[in-house]
């Protein structure tokens, strides 16, 4: 069954589902990214040699969808009896391993399941395991070792460096990359067609740009903009409603910063006021402004040492924003950074 036939055949009230769930792949062949990983997993499933798995990579790259599709492939309609899914960011302590996981792996399969299904290993899916405490990871390693004969574990995280090395060594690790723009464009265009969303071509490109390979973020943004606008979506709608900066506006801010000179005190004050006006009128957050400025700085004519100085101090400026320093003061700090760089 094709991806779109699967979506059409689902029986739940689809209009009430968030699009990110409504259009989540249901079969392993429906996943559009990381094809090398998909091929490897299909071979494991076909040969019944699925190892413990560790999926890592950025958000929205298909990690959770992939293992759920694998589970459907293995268990079919009995999936709810054979898997335990936990989010480790909510249940990050050692008690989770002691109780929920141990109880699941030690329990016998339901007598109502067919013999062929009862003989298959169970599956524990642990999402966001990089949020788990060190102690909990240590106990999880022991649980995996003791129950390898009856249970497989799939550990999912964004940051593999936060995972116990001993735990990593017991799993087949797969790095998920952000989705490429072509795949994202195709899926978003198809969703627009199925939902009757009218849009300008550049609007989809803008969603892809601000999502940075995160398919979940892209679909959520598309649905959000569509709900607010209700008509044909354009690029300005996407940036305004998602809270991101229009490229032209960020370029205007950068041009002001690039021209700053520490010897022109009046010019500095006026320039900062101009930037404050732009940021306020366009409802731009400091975080998003800095994110876009990073990209422009990296493509600019600044020397390598100047770029390093600015990017390093952008990170410190983001910290000020995170502790609620007044945004006008942050913009003054930002201007002073460029004054310094322009006169080094």
Swiss-Prot record:
Entry-linked Pfam families = AAA, RCF1-5-like_lid
Question: Which CDD domains does this entry report, sorted A to Z?
Answer: AAA, HLD_clamp_RFC
Q: Which SMART domains match?
A: AAA (SM00382)
Q: In its keyword annotation, does this UniProt entry include ATP-binding?
A: yes
Q: Name one GO molecular function term.
A: ATP binding
GO biological process terms, alphabetically, are:
DNA repair; DNA-templated DNA replication
Q: Which UniProt keywords apply?
A: ATP-binding, DNA replication, Nucleotide-binding
Entry-linked Gene3D superfamilies:
1.10.8.60, P-loop containing nucleotide triphosphate hydrolases
Q: Briefly state the protein's biological role.
A: Part of the RFC clamp loader complex which loads the PCNA sliding clamp onto DNA.
| UniProt name for this protein | Putative replication factor C small subunit L499
